[in-house]
Design a protein with these regions (language model features):
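Canonical positions in the second alpha-helix
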Residues: 35-37, 72-73, 108-109, 144-145
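N-terminal signal peptide c-region/cleavage motif recognized by signal peptidases
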Residues: 7-9
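Glycine-centered coil turns and helix-coil junctions that link the paired helices
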Residues: 19-21, 41, 53-59, 77, ...
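Start-of-helix register in tetratricopeptide repeats
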Residues: 12, 44, 80, 116, ...
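Terminal, low-structured helical/coil segments at or just beyond the last alpha-helical repeat
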Residues: 17, 151-188
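Hydrophobic face of amphipathic alpha-helices that form TPR/SEL1-like repeat modules
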Residues: 14-21, 33, 37, 46-55, ...
Length: 188
């Protein structure tokens, strides 16, 4: 949950004002500007508020408030917010720990290409948290995560491969191709 959406465009909207204030380390000013943008449904502002509350930047650290803002952005399809919700459910931050919900939000972000979410799905499949344990699917998601640029996914996948049969590896490679062909949709 260390990502802030700082993409700025041409106009000086409340979101853009928040970006400028954040870049100048005026965290309270950024919070105020992003609250205005979030009130109009701006998912990037909602995500940023969630991150600020989670980190305690410009406000007291408050995971419940972080969850609230992240949930609003995630409901609009923001992959970073969906991943953040997965982390919160996974660790019980601002919400009761719930591996099934964590899996759900990681999957939504993973299907949009989020490498961290793809990695986390691999972990959940490997450990059987929120989903039935399945080493083939764990290997599949770690492979997809590595292809998306996750730095640890390749190492973890290689370790997992040592405990898999050649048939399991072939099955995983087939799943990887199918997932890539379907643009990551319905890969779980």
């Amino acid at each position: 949950m260390t990502l802030l959406c700082l993409t700025s465009g041409v106009s000086a909207s409340p979101f853009e004002e928040g970006v400028a204030k954040y870049k100048n380390a005026d965290y309270m000013g950024a919070i105020n500007a992003w609250r205005l943008a979030a009130a109009t449904g701006n998912a990037r502002a909602q995500l940023n508020l969630g991150v600020m509350y989670a980190k305690g930047q410009g406000v007291a650290q408050d995971y419940t408030e972080a969850f609230k803002w992240s949930r609003l952005a995630a409901a609009q399809g923001n992959a970073d917010a969906q991943y953040s919700l997965g982390v919160m459910y996974d660790g019980g931050q601002g919400v009761a720990q719930d591996y099934v919900e964590a899996f759900k939000w990681y999957r939504l972000a993973a299907e949009q290409g989020d490498a961290d979410a793809q990695y986390s799905l691999g972990v959940m499949y490997d450990e059987g948290q929120g989903v039935a344990q399945n080493h083939v699917r764990a290997y599949t998601w770690w492979s997809l995560s590595a292809a998306s640029g996750h730095t640890n996914a390749k190492k973890v996948r290689e370790l997992a491969e040592k405990n898999m049969t050649s048939q399991q590896i072939l099955e995983a490679q087939k799943m990887i191709r199918e997932c890539q062909h379907k643009k990551l949709q319905a890969c779980t």
